[in-house]
Amino acid sequence: MISKEQKLALIKEFGGSEKNTGLAEVQIAILTAEISNMTEHLKMHKKDIPTRRSLLKKVAQRRHFLDYLVKKDVNRYKEIIEKLGIRK
């Protein structure tokens, strides 16, 4: 889980303002931060199956947002992938 401060920083960076939380880029950025935190946790706790399941759910959720972004605006998709360092 990421802190409120980290989440607010991501919202400001990718959404433009604090209230623009529904933007696909914001959702993808938040999910990416949560995924990286869970990945670090799983490196230390290899047998934590519930966290692994949650990680897979978040990866699938991020994939849905990315697919949506590809359909709506390919340029925004390419920008977010480049900024976050996500594979295609």
Curated annotation (Swiss-Prot):
Which cellular components does GO assign to this protein? Answer: cytosolic small ribosomal subunit
Q: Which InterPro entries does the record associate with it?
A: Ribosomal_uS15 (IPR000589), Ribosomal_uS15_bac-type (IPR005290), uS15_NS1_RNA-bd_sf (IPR009068)
SMART domains assigned: Ribosomal_S15
Q: Which UniProt keywords apply?
A: Ribonucleoprotein, Ribosomal protein, RNA-binding, rRNA-binding
> In its UniProt record, which GO terms are filed under biological process?
translation
Q: Which residues form a coiled coil?
A: none
Q: Which Gene3D superfamilies match?
A: 6.10.250.3130, S15/NS1, RNA-binding
A GO molecular-function descriptor? structural constituent of ribosome
Transmembrane region(s)? none
> Belongs to which family?
Belongs to the universal ribosomal protein uS15 family.
Subunit and interaction comment = Part of the 30S ribosomal subunit. Forms a bridge to the 50S subunit in the 70S ribosome, contacting the 23S rRNA.
The free-text function statement in the UniProt record for this protein reads: One of the primary rRNA binding proteins, it binds directly to 16S rRNA where it helps nucleate assembly of the platform of the 30S subunit by binding and bridging several RNA helices of the 16S rRNA. Forms an intersubunit bridge (bridge B4) with the 23S rRNA of the 50S subunit in the ribosome.
Name under which the protein is recorded = Small ribosomal subunit protein uS15
Say which species the protein is native to.
Mycoplasma capricolum subsp. capricolum (strain California kid / ATCC 27343 / NCTC 10154)
